[in-house]
């Protein structure tokens, strides 16, 4: 179904899978990836070698262009080449320094894991994958963060091969044997991951880190097998309220400032569902499905499921307001840390106010690469 996501009544806080659903979720916040006890991670060459299309060239140390990766795992796993740096009391990764606006410290890793839990709660069933996929397929996670989604998928499907890539090397060293991570890796640069070789490519919360969505979608398209799927999950952080005006509220001002600052950095945080669907279509995707889920900022609703979603989102957004503001407001506007903390405190105060029925929208897309003629 095609929904534009631009106005109208608040969508429900539950998304039903439009297609086959498989996967797994963590049962509570304490299991959000901090107890990842699997070991003996495979090298990406081993993972690809077990796939049906692999053919390695020992002399070149690379994979042929038949659907297999060509990637230097040693250099991609050497974080010492790009040391982290401190800014406004937070730690940022040094790879592509200054481009990405979010930190990579333990506090940020916890925040990302909270969002992962939120998504599994807001989406029915297991909340991991809605797009059709083989249980023994090859899955690629773009901007994998802590790797929690990739690890959950790898644990659910022991016959699958799951690879996560990210700018920051913050993934755990111990993870399932059928899962591996490559960082630092910039998915906006040229890939060497094998065209026509992936059964599913996944991405969540990419807004704010992408300069050209059309270019990225074309690259994703070329790396999927014919008939395979791309799934994307994004939050539109523009505040909405159906029973009052948000004019004059700190949360509205904060979003407008964040939107302006990230637009000036050429990686806007604002999400537009119409543009997303159009860009997916122009990249060649078909069978595009778009779902919207309401995310209340606090548990003001009477429905118990909506209240549960809201409690998780209240925690997630409370951890996000200052974090998302620090780099954009200080680098673009030149704001001192005290001013940033003040507006963040004002926004959080409104987010906790149950008299203000504010919500954001979670967008979920599935798009298919057509079968070859």
Swiss-Prot record:
Q: What is its main location?
A: nucleus
Keyword annotations of the record = Methyltransferase, Nucleus, S-adenosyl-L-methionine, Sporulation, Transcription, Transcription regulation, Transferase
Q: Provide ranges: composition bias, Polar residues.
A: 67-77
Gene3D superfamilies in the record, alphabetically? Vaccinia Virus protein VP39
Pfam families this protein is in? Answer: Methyltransf_23 (PF13489)
**What's the catalysed reaction?**
L-methionyl-[protein] + S-adenosyl-L-methionine = S-methyl-L-methionyl-[protein] + S-adenosyl-L-homocysteine
Start and end residues of each stretch annotated as Disordered: 1-21, 53-81
The record's Gene Ontology biological-process terms are: methylation; sporulation resulting in formation of a cellular spore
- Cellular component GO terms, alphabetical: nucleus
Q: Which Enzyme Commission number(s) are listed?
A: 2.1.1.-
Instruction: Give the PANTHER family listed for this entry.
Output: METHYLTRANSFERASE (PTHR43591), PROTEIN-METHIONINE METHYLTRANSFERASE LAEA (PTHR43591:SF30)
The record's comment on protein family reads: Belongs to the methyltransferase superfamily. LaeA methyltransferase family.
How would you summarize the oligomeric state and partners of this protein? Answer: Component of the heterotrimeric velvet complex composed of laeA, veA and velB; VeA acting as a bridging protein between laeA and velB.
The name on file for this protein is: Secondary metabolism regulator laeA
